[in-house]
A protein has these predicted regions:
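Bacterial N-terminal signal peptides that target proteins for export
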Residues: 1-11
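Bacterial N-terminal signal peptides
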Residues: 9-20
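Accessory terminal helices/loops
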Residues: 16, 25-34, 140, 245-250, ...
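Metallo-beta-lactamase
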Residues: 27, 46, 69, 76-78, 94, 129-190, ...
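Conserved beta-strand hairpin/beta-sheet module of binuclear metal-dependent hydrolase folds
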Residues: 41-90, 200-213
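Active-site metal-binding motif and surrounding structural segment of the metallo-beta-lactamase
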Residues: 44, 66-67, 78-123, 172
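Divalent metal-coordination and catalytic microenvironments
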Residues: 50, 63, 73, 102, ...
């Protein structure tokens, strides 16, 4: 591994333990190369005379007052230095406060750069628990993110302990916290959504609301493929209602560009809220009607007027996230109560079918019929009996490449790319 690759790996692993691909999804892009994630904003964007931002993997915002600056979110470790350089060139006043909308690494990565003697750092009280949760599973997430972003899989990490996170905030609050600096009032409210430590910031003087990740230009990641604690759909709904209750003239998300004008804010956030509410309610109705999660994943579709796009979050993942979040993993099938997986009997099925080549032929038939996902299931069965069976690996690669070619979701693309690389490696191909 050369020096550039090493630096790239270190930067991405640090960044991606808690980050995401949202910036690419919002631009309608699918990241095909890990280096694409490291593009740094190269200019300051003036939202108004007092509020400035720099875009990146996560945005950094500066609100300037006569008594000093307030920084809202600090981007990732990779972007933070450039963001700091650009914004301090704009205004060199002391940083009096740093406000963290939540504990993901693409919002907290620049705290050490912005923190000065006497700087107060504000977060919602659940920030402590959330940071400990992330640190507790740092090794797990490092492996997941390395897989998704084409990095070397790290060696197993030493467990740091249950409560080993570094806690930066000096002020923690429950529901609301307010302060005034240089005649500018800042009202901070709890807004659980993407995380349970999430907050938003209302600046009434400018009728501006910093919304963190309550809203972005895609259906939300109610479940994220890297794994996460439950994200509650109704938390999103309630927090979006709270955003709109301020009647803001400008909403400033931590990913993407501001939404300007109360009418446009109301239109977009109402559509977003109603889309989430619709999916949640349809899942709950289906659960109460006795439908299983796969039936609901197949049946539930957004009405055209609520279609907010699926470039980042995806409907079927959110449906399953809502379902499993409410009731967990037991599906009423007694076999799932025990510690023997379905895959453990796949070799018996393969033997009965006449060997893995026979299953591979069936997978190819499914591909020809247009069902690449069913083909993947069949290759799972075949490869459980013989992990090096070439015809099964070739069928698997063909199915994956079909899914890859039609993929329009950034997170989905990352995992398809990972599986393509792994399958090619098993076939002895370079990638």
């Amino acid at each position: 591994m050369n020096r550039h690759s090493t630096l790239l790996s270190l930067a991405l692993l640090t960044l991606l333990v808690t980050g995401n691909l949202l910036v690419f999804a919002q631009q309608g892009l699918v990241a095909n190369n890990p280096a694409e994630l490291l593009r740094v904003g190269d200019k300051v964007i003036k939202i108004n005379d007092a509020i400035s931002m720099v875009q990146g993997f996560g945005n950094t915002f500066m609100v300037s007052t006569s008594e000093g600056n307030v920084i809202i979110d600090t981007s990732s470790v990779f972007h933070a230095r450039k963001h700091h350089e650009l914004l301090t060139a704009e205004n060199k006043s002391p940083v009096r406060y740093i406000i963290l909308t939540h504990g993901h690494g693409d919002h907290t990565g620049g705290v050490p750069l912005w923190k000065e003697a006497g700087t107060q750092i504000i977060a919602q009280k659940h920030h402590v628990d959330f940071m400990n949760y992330q640190t507790r599973l740092a090794g797990f997430y490092a492996k997941r993110n390395a897989a998704q972003f084409a990095l070397n899989i790290p060696e197993p990490a030493r467990w740091a302990g249950n409560y080993a996170a570094k806690i930066e905030p000096t002020i923690l609050f429950d529901d609301k916290y307010e302060f005034t600096l240089g005649g500018v009032k800042f009202e901070i409210c709890s807004a659980p959504s993407e995380t349970y430590d999430h907050l938003m910031v209302w600046v009434p003087k400018y009728k501006a609301l910093f919304s963190g990740d309550v809203y972005y230009e895609s259906f939300p990641n109610i479940y994220t493929l890297r794994g996460t604690q439950p994200r509650w759909a109704l938390d999103y709904v309630n927090s979006l209602n709270k955003v709109m209750s301020f009647n803001p003239e400008i909403v400033i998300p931590s990913h993407g560009m501001p939404i300007r004008g109360n009418a446009e804010v109301t239109r977009r956030l109402t559509q977003y809220r109603d889309a989430i509410q619709y999916v949640h309610d349809e899942v709950v109705k289906g659960m109460n009607a006795g439908k299983d999660v796969y039936t609901l994943m197949h049946e539930i579709k957004l009405p055209a007027n609520l279609d907010v796009g699926e470039s980042y979050g995806k409907l079927i993942w959110s449906i399953r996230g809502i379902y499993d979040g409410y009731v967990g993993w037991f599906d009423m099938d007694p076999v799932t109560m025990y510690d023997t997986s379905a895959a453990s009997v796949y070799p018996d099925v393969v033997k009965l079918a006449g060997g893995p080549d026979a299953i591979a032929r069936l997978a190819l038939q499914r591909i020809e019929a247009g069902d690449a996902v069913a083909a993947l299931h069949l290759t799972d069965i075949a490869l459980a009996a013989d992990s090096s069976n070439r015809s099964s690996l070739e069928a698997r690669l063909k199915a994956l490449e079909i899914l890859q070619a039609r993929c329009k979701n950034t997170n989905e693309r990352g995992w398809l790319d990972y599986s393509v690389r792994a399958t090619k490696a098993s076939l002895g191909e370079k990638h």
